[in-house]
C-alpha cells in the first residue's frame, strides 16, 4: 500500500464508540480526536471496541479528525 505524503500517524486508545462507525480516540500525547474506520478495515469486518489500541492517521489540515488504519491484536 502506498504511503500518503503529509499524514501524521499516531497511536491511541479508543475511549468511546459513536454512531455511524465514528470513535473518540485518546492519543498518546493526551489529545482527543474523532476518528472513522478506514475502508479496508470496514471491508474486512474488523471490529473496534472501546479500550482497543489503534493507529490513527491525521491530516495536517485538521488535527481534530482522523482515520483508524490499524487495530493492535
UniProtKB/Swiss-Prot annotation:
Residue intervals passing through the bilayer: none
UniProt-recorded Gene Ontology molecular function terms: ribosome binding; rRNA binding; translation initiation factor activity
What cellular component GO annotations does this protein have?
A: cytosol
Recite the UniProt keywords alphabetically: Cytoplasm, Initiation factor, Protein biosynthesis, RNA-binding, rRNA-binding
Q: Which residues form a coiled coil?
A: none
Q: Which residues are in the S1-like domain?
A: 1-73
Q: Where in the cell is it found?
A: Cytoplasm
Keyword RNA-binding recorded: yes
- Any Pfam family: eIF-1a
Q: Which domain of life is it from?
A: Bacteria
InterPro entries, per the entry: NA-bd_OB-fold (IPR012340), RNA-binding_domain_S1_IF1 (IPR006196), TIF_IF1 (IPR004368)
Its primary localisation, in coarse terms, equals cytoplasm
Subunit-level organization: Component of the 30S ribosomal translation pre-initiation complex which assembles on the 30S ribosome in the order IF-2 and IF-3, IF-1 and N-formylmethionyl-tRNA(fMet); mRNA recruitment can occur at any time during PIC assembly.
**What function does this protein fulfil?**
One of the essential components for the initiation of protein synthesis. Stabilizes the binding of IF-2 and IF-3 on the 30S subunit to which N-formylmethionyl-tRNA(fMet) subsequently binds. Helps modulate mRNA selection, yielding the 30S pre-initiation complex (PIC). Upon addition of the 50S ribosomal subunit IF-1, IF-2 and IF-3 are released leaving the mature 70S translation initiation complex.
Q: Which family does it belong to?
A: Belongs to the IF-1 family.
Q: What is this protein called?
A: Translation initiation factor IF-1
Species, as recorded: Leifsonia xyli subsp. xyli (strain CTCB07)
Amino acid at each position: 500500500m502506498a504511503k500518503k505524503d503529509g499524514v501524521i500517524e499516531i497511536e491511541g486508545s479508543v475511549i468511546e464508540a459513536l454512531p455511524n462507525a465514528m470513535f473518540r480516540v485518546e492519543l498518546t500525547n493526551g489529545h482527543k480526536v474523532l476518528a472513522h474506520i478506514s475502508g479496508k478495515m470496514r471491508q474486512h469486518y474488523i471490529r473496534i471496541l472501546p479500550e482497543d489500541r489503534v493507529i490513527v492517521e491525521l491530516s495536517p489540515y485538521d488535527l481534530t479528525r482522523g482515520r483508524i488504519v490499524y487495530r493492535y491484536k
